[in-house]
A protein has these predicted regions:
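Acetyl-CoA-dependent GNAT
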Residues: 1-35, 41-45, 118-119
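Short hydrophobic/aromatic beta-strand or adjacent loop that forms the aromatic wall/cage
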Residues: 1-3, 109-114
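A conserved short alpha-helix in the GNAT/GCN5 acetyltransferase fold that borders
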Residues: 35, 44-52, 75
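Short glycine-rich hinge loops at helix-strand junctions in the catalytic core
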Residues: 38, 55, 78
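Conserved active-site alpha-helix within GNAT-family acetyltransferase domains
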Residues: 41, 65-104
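Conserved GNAT acetyl-CoA-binding A-motif
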Residues: 51-65, 73
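Generic C-terminal helix-cap and adjacent flexible tail
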Residues: 119-134
């Protein structure tokens, strides 16, 4: 796994981790301590640039159906819903019962959603202040 950090002064305010294989780049985590300040967008732009450098044709992220803010963010930066894995969380819960039944905003958790972004050369729509590679 590799990733990027976003700093404000001495504070780490964001982290994106990813894995690259022959299929492209999978974003594993994207976290920000400050919402609405462009941190997620900045980190995602860094990931897109890295994917381009490594010859990836796509980036994808998998999330659960209750993560409405995650789904919204990724669609705003150009990702498209590519696949819904129906009932996969229910199946996982049978093995790991501590997986919650209900998530964000009271939405029942049942499915995984795969969102994907096709990488286009030199597409710079998010704006980046630069992040530290980790």
């Amino acid at each position: 796994e590799e990733g990027f950090l976003e700093r404000r002064g001495n504070d780490i305010v964001g982290l994106l981790t990813y894995h690259i294989d022959e299929r492209g780049m999978e974003v594993l985590t994207l976290n920000s301590t400050l919402e609405g300040q462009g941190i997620g967008s900045s980190l995602m732009l860094s990931a897109i640039d890295r994917a381009r450098e490594r010859g990836c044709e796509k980036i994808w992220i998998t999330t659960t159906n209750d993560r409405l803010r995650v789904i919204d963010f990724h669609q705003r930066v150009g990702f498209r819903m590519m696949k819904i894995n129906l009932g996969v969380v229910d199946e996982a819960r049978a093995i790991k019962p501590q997986i919650p039944l209900v998530g964000e905003r009271g939405v029942p958790i049942h499915d995984e959603i795969v969102l994907e972004l096709e990488i286009e050369p030199y597409l710079d729509t998010l704006g980046s202040e630069g992040n530290d590679s980790v």
